[in-house]
């Protein structure tokens, strides 16, 4: 009963903190941390200690999985270099620097134990991402922070494990640590990918959305547990499974399953994140009490925590600054090279497109200047492959893939050019590296043989709580002062391009329908397709693009703010009325009269039902074609991830409304 009461009170605290966070302009995590600390110091509340495995093995995998599902895989690929620097290199450098300083200022602390403490203080917390997103900073900053948060926990735990082993056994080498880390990541990659693919195949066969959601809750653990038993990182495996699910899910899973899962997972994330910070605050009193019982000074711990916390910020800034300089040079080099090669690339793309369409022989020589290296060398290699004897279908497929690669590279260059990471953005990234509950959970994994373990635990929780409070509360002020690039509405050009994309997809469905009807009704060729081209183009275009309308005015952070369920349905009905009603009798069938005898009324009702069913079928075909077109464009990176996500959500909601059945 006591546990049940605690759980209920905790849920109410999470709900209350989330509800009032906007009013007080403080992140819910910080409010819950403060509540936990206050409650933990009440005389009626005993000292609380939570097993670290509950957080590291029970809470972190689903949280990281949920974040990975929601991240844009194309943006994650683009920012992979930044993520590797921050999630791997920065963690190692932070552990080494902090460990070296602690060795000097804490008597009797060996280098191995000091590096272990440094590893504990290295991983960042996801609360910075939620704060930055609420402030509206650019999506590129959010992607960098999200990618770092997905992987740095695993890196820190590997460094912590290696340092602890070195301190107790003294048989660890640098090469051994590197090999162990590489093996851990490779195992996690294999297990995570396999679990992601297998569970998608399983979920595609599930017909109930609730059952699918239940199965989705097992995925992070299905990935993490085997990976851990095979010597890999369970956290990385959960992340990889999430990336696979997020990338392939829209093509495999029905929209009602995805919508139900997203809503349920959002609630689960809210509860799990809230409990993490409540638990962190509640444990504060027990750690302080243990330190007081063992003798070390609380004041000394506070000063050391201030020193360690300052080092985390300085080291992060020292790594972020050269990383940004390198990224800027890389982006400029890409843009310059692409501009120099623009004419040749366009010629190559045109020839490959012609091969893909079958307009020219697939073995035709394609002129190219081979004096350049880099991209040109890779394209030349692809060209030589195209010239090898092969089937026309395979050549056309390779040519199409080459065009996709060029379009993807062009979109990458535009992305780096339009959303640069400068000093202003770097200041936000550096200041957003606050520590959190993972730091405390990792510190609790220190073995009992660690010298002054409770004292080191106190330093860890002071650094985590202090960085959350100081950096979390001042991050809005930093954003206001440095003025980084902010996330804005989709521009008119992108909106128009998405509009055209959806219209083209709808035209494809209409053309297919005309081809099918040509076989059954000779002489009716092109009737429906002509409507989109010639008959009041404004109304059909608006209807076809209903799922992308208001991208520039309604979107903030990729969330759908409204539904226009009649959009694609209106277009389908319009086409059926004009296409099937080309003669008077067909017109009467499409728009039956509402007067006449009972027999005529019965025929009219049947005609209306038939017309409604035909409209529904065409609408669903259009929606699915538009979704495929959006997903293809998203994989190439042709549009911003937020615009693609918003348009997909609108299509999903429209399809759900068309396919839903009353219970």
Language model features with spans:
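Transmembrane helical cores of multi-pass secondary ion antiporters/exchangers
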Residues: 1-504, 556, 561, 589, ...
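Long amphipathic all-alpha helical oligomerization modules
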Residues: 603-614, 621
């Amino acid at each position: 009963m006591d546990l049940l009461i605690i759980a209920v009170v905790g849920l109410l605290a999470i709900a209350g903190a989330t509800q009032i966070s906007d009013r007080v302009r403080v992140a819910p995590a910080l409010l819950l941390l403060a509540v936990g600390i206050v409650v933990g110091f009440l005389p009626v509340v005993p000292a609380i200690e939570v097993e670290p495995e509950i957080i590291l093995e029970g809470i972190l995998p689903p949280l990281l999985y949920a974040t990975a599902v929601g991240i844009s895989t194309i943006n994650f690929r683009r920012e992979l270099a930044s993520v590797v620097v921050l999630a791997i290199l920065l963690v190692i450098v932070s552990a080494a620097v902090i460990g070296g300083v602690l060795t000097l200022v804490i008597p009797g602390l060996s280098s191995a134990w000091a590096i272990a403490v440094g590893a504990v203080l290295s991983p960042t917390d996801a609360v910075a991402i939620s704060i930055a997103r609420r402030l509206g900073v650019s999506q590129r900053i959010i992607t960098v922070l999200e990618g770092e948060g997905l992987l740095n926990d695993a890196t820190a735990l590997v460094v912590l494990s290696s340092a602890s082993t070195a301190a107790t056994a003294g048989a660890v080498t640098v090469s051994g640590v590197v090999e162990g880390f590489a093996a851990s990541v490779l195992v996690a990659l294999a297990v995570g990918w396999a679990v992601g693919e297998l569970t998608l195949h399983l979920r595609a066969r599930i017909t109930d959305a609730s059952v699918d959601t239940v199965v989705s809750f097992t995925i992070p653990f299905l990935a993490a547990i085997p990976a851990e038993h095979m010597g890999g990182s369970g956290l990385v495996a959960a992340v990889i499974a999430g990336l696979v699910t997020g990338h392939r899910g829209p093509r495999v899973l029905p929209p009602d399953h995805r919508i139900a899962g997203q809503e349920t997972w959002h609630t689960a994330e809210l509860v799990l994140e809230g409990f993490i910070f409540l638990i962190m605050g509640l444990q504060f009193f027990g750690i302080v009490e243990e330190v007081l019982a063992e003798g070390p000074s609380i004041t000394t711990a506070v000063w050391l925590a201030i020193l360690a916390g300052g080092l985390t910020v300085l080291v992060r800034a020292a790594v972020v600054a050269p990383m940004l300089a390198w990224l800027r040079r890389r982006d400029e080099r890409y843009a310059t090279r692409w501009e120099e090669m623009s004419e040749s690339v366009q010629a190559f793309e045109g020839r490959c497109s012609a091969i893909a369409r079958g307009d020219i022989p697939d073995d035709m020589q394609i002129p190219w200047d081979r004096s350049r290296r880099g991209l040109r060398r890779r394209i030349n290699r692809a060209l030589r492959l195209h010239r090898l004897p092969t089937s026309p279908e395979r050549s056309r497929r390779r040519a199409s893939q080459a065009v996709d690669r060029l379009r993807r590279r062009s979109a990458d260059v535009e992305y780096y050019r339009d959303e640069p990471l400068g000093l202003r953005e770097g200041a936000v990234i550096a200041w957003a590296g606050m520590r959190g509950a993972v730091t405390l959970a990792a510190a609790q994994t220190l073995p009992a043989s660690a010298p002054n373990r409770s004292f080191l635990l106190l330093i860890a929780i002071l650094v985590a709580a202090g960085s959350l409070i100081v950096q979390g509360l001042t991050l809005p002020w930093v954003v206001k002062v440095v003025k980084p690039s902010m996330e804005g509405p989709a521009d008119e050009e992108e909106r128009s391009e998405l509009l055209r994309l959806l219209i083209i997809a709808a035209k494809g469905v209409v053309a297919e329908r005309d081809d099918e009807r040509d076989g059954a009704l000779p002489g009716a060729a092109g009737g429906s397709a002509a409507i989109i081209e010639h008959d009041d183009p404004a109304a059909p275009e608006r209807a076809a693009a209903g799922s992308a309308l208001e991208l520039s005015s309604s979107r903030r952070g990729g969330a759908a703010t409204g539904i226009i369920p009649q959009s694609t349905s209106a277009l389908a009905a319009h086409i059926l009325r004009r296409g099937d009603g080309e003669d008077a009798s067909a017109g009467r069938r499409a728009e039956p009269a509402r007067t006449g005898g009972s027999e005529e009324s019965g025929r009219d009702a049947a005609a209306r039902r038939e017309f409604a069913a035909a409209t529904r079928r065409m609408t669903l075909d259009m929606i699915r074609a538009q979704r495929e077109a959006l997903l293809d464009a998203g994989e190439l990176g042709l549009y911003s991830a937020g615009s693609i996500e918003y348009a997909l959500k609108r299509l999903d909601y429209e399809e759900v409304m068309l396919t839903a059945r009353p219970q």
